[in-house]
Amino acid sequence: MSWNGVKRKVAKITTWEQRRDSMNGACFNCHDHTFVDNFYHQFDSLVVLYNDKFAKPAQQLMDELTKDGVLSAKAPFEHEVQWVFWELWHHEGRRARHGASMMGPDYTHWHGMYEVSKHFYMKFLPAVVDAAAEKSPELRKKYQEKVTQLLTRDENRWIKGLSPEEAAALKKAFKERYNQWRGSWI
């Protein structure tokens, strides 16, 4: 059914590759190949970043919580972690992906990936441990260890911060690259 109640039939199902080729045709009406290729590189990179850093680890934790009997498929919004998980995908994640697809930096970053990051680290991961703790102390410990292990991955190193040597090297590289600017914050 369509929005107006009239039943419609899809004439042809196309693949994502066919849809992208069709969209490229529209893009090339105004933009050259470099512009279009760079856009898709940035867009695809954001989707991969979202998927690999947030969506896949979150889905794995949700699947494991379900397997351990902490979550029930019959009660999809029983625990806080289920709400936050849904919002990571549907609300913040969708805004980031749609913002990137429409070249909207404010929606891509502030209303998208910033919110995804904030809720993943500050709400979702603690809610994983809290949900497990409701089931048993053993599961709380198991999921605290899983979260701790996740936070040791390279993409999450920022949480720990830089060593003094790493900070000095970063500051030196920054000054070498931007030495024409003498701001007080460097």
Language-model segments: residues:
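Primarily the internal scaffold of c-type cytochrome electron-transfer domains
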Residues: 1-186
